[in-house]
């Protein structure tokens, strides 16, 4: 939910920290701050409420320079959005700490520290860490030892970084449940929550695991567990390009990412089409054995990824002919669940760090599930590393808080999963005939066709901007797309929107319909179209204004109070991927008309790494 970055360098580190914070701003943007060790090892701190741009102006005004430093961009969890709660937190003008996560036992730790004479100036759980490190530094031989002792007292999820005026050539970092990686360069060592923040200085990275504590010095890098036993982490070369995280000609990252979807979907499907759905090539070593005799599938996800699994569940049942269920990670982990040794557990997460999903995976494994598969956009993240199999969607970096290309590439991956399960050993007798890879090659073109409707969608969006509420309807495979459309609209335009299966209208939601309630209908030319048309008549008869996304081969025509936009010819089971595009564009352009911050909507962050 927050982003941290910093390191130790032989040159001034302040520009790198500020640029890194800008690249991490999608993780949190309530406030930002940095601390450096100056020329005389003085601990210097600057904090500001608002965006990184405000922090940059304050840093430039003070002329800060230093070769050891830490930075933070915040999404508030403990304490309001005030400068006193912005990181870094300082103890006795000697220790500075930045922190991503939540310390669950901070009330008890705070009471203990207050009894020991420590004074608190913020409402945050992070200040506890700063005082703990200071407390242990009084007897520890160095900052590294003090940090290890301090994190041993913490319960919860965290990625932290610590500097000290008494250890002027050192940064210490620790990870438990939140993403943290190290960067290796000729001129020093660095850390960040996301590899994008390290691209200006290095592509050589190491991913820390839970329980790791690391000491960074200019020429030295040491990783241990909390007890001090040495740990080794493999070095990777990041393939991420700097251009991939730049806006280019686009106004917003969300706009850029919407328009990248034809390529992202094509890249995600490329390996499958080239390998003819070879299980090992597509899903990794052990996939054939893992998929053999699977008798049900459990999907675990949160947010937009959960909506993708609602589609995937239906694909599995239609194509493979076995039961499937889709659960929210934060609900699954706290309820009683009956394990099934032949059940495949599939987790979806764009970042691979979504805490609710990760903990749900842990719960499933604790129950004895060994058949686990992660579908993720970040290869070396926590959820794929904790899974037996992994599939990497090739969406590229997604910076906008509202997910777009990650969603459609997840859908593409789920369709491939259904096809793969249908051809796995022991599956032939139970499979339906509905699934076919034949239309996959045409899918990127259909997505581009949907994008070409953007000028028409802009006209619709102008009508939405003045509305307070909206209703989205769909049936079957397209009800989850209605859910996704409603979520996108409320996320970035702040228009209250709800989604329902169209058949539920008469059971309550129809009471909401009037002339001020726009009703968006996902209306593909499938076997439910006539049923859906009847539901639309119910809305029209009560004065509701209909906005219909139909296929080019459907019979819908525009009339008074009924607006129709035609997508490509019906894409069969792949239709949800195509119909996701216009609801994304509708939300984006409605937000533009309203003047909201599209990439950084209020109260939201991209990577939800706290419970």
UniProtKB/Swiss-Prot annotation:
Catalytic activity: D-fructose 6-phosphate + L-glutamine = D-glucosamine 6-phosphate + L-glutamate
One Pfam family in the UniProt entry: SIS
SIS domain ranges (all copies): 287-427, 460-601
An annotated GO cellular component: cytosol
Keywords: Aminotransferase, Cytoplasm, Glutamine amidotransferase, Repeat, Transferase
One annotated GO biological process: UDP-N-acetylglucosamine metabolic process
Top-rank taxon, per record: Bacteria
Classification via InterPro entries: GATase_2_dom (IPR017932), GFAT (IPR005855), GFAT_N (IPR047084), GlmS/AgaS_SIS (IPR035466), GlmS/FrlB_SIS (IPR035490), Ntn_hydrolases_N (IPR029055), SIS_dom (IPR001347), SIS_dom_sf (IPR046348)
Enzyme class: transferase
Domain Glutamine amidotransferase type-2: start-end pairs: 2-219
EC annotation from Swiss-Prot or TrEMBL: 2.6.1.16
GO molecular function, one term: carbohydrate derivative binding
Localization in the cell: Cytoplasm
SUPFAM superfamilies in alphabetical order: N-terminal nucleophile aminohydrolases (Ntn hydrolases) (SSF56235), SIS domain (SSF53697)
Active site: 2 (nucleophile), 606 (for fru-6p isomerization activity)
HAMAP family for the chain: GlmS
Assembly and interaction partners: Homodimer.
Entry function: Catalyzes the first step in hexosamine metabolism, converting fructose-6P into glucosamine-6P using glutamine as a nitrogen source.
Protein name (database record): Glutamine--fructose-6-phosphate aminotransferase [isomerizing]
Species name: Acidithiobacillus ferridurans
